[in-house]
């Protein structure tokens, strides 16, 4: 064998190896599915509760200044609903077999974490894929209701309380706000709008009780387990107003007024009868008996309304019938969540879900006091207001006008203007 012939054979062998290698590489590439190169997402709705400050906080951000309420997009900064991101197909994926893509998508979904799993309270986003599908629309509806309530409240404040944004928050403005630090919640107490049961819920959230049913009325109202916001120094107040979720629950004003009257004056009461009852009977009942003046018992609803509307009333106001706009200062404090007594169960449990409360905690439905007595309803409210003249009804409506306006309640009587 000559050296020239050996060299030619080696060259041919090397060329054959390169040719087979290139052919194998092309075959391998042609068998790959380009869809594997593009990320897949599980279909569903992504609900995002984003903090405003600090970034790692999982709660809704609140501003104490009305001037900072509106974001450029026009959506509230508290609850934020986002549509799901649509997966982007790879440019070469159009020709891939449909069956192969579906099979690989199913395999990918199986590897995803379970929907609705909370990956920790420090996460700034909560991904919820409610089941069944009807829960999706329910969640969206409750979210939209919150947006509308806050919009109405902002507009009323802008129209009638234009100077509020320039006022500083003082301890007096936050004296009715209760603090729950574990879940970073601030709750403004509105008496006769479910406040007793809300305090029970806060005590369970704080780890002070295992069940709302175990907490007695006196513990709720006369104990010191829950802190008020005005007990903190200024730095503590400002910090919590800026970073905690602030919420309040309201009630139809006439209905709330009647509920307060029934509770405080139609049942024995060692405080309201001697303090308010005696003063009301002495001023507004002609020829009141000695017994009535001694005990303060037996105040009638028209007499109570006379006291309420009197600018020179003989005894001051009380939180049970004071305006919500005075109790909670909603034009000065930017509340993230506005619930209503009339839709308490839905609103309360929606709120508990938003703050990642324990799954077994729901809002209690029992009546706190006088459980044998019917709740104050619209029908009962009309019966009490039927005892008043049309002028008294109008003046009472005027008295609560800001509450009707801010919380979008309809006029309770057709002859009101």
UniProtKB/Swiss-Prot annotation:
Membrane topology: Single-pass type II membrane protein
Main localization of the protein described in the UniProt heading: Golgi
Pfam families documented for this protein: Sulfotransfer_2
Molecular function as annotated in GO: dermatan 4-sulfotransferase activity
Transmembrane segments: 11-31
Chain coiled-coil ranges: none
Subcellular location as annotated: Golgi apparatus membrane
Record: glycosylation sites: 121-122, 287, 360, 408
Name of the molecule in the record: Carbohydrate sulfotransferase 8
Organism: Mus musculus (Mouse)
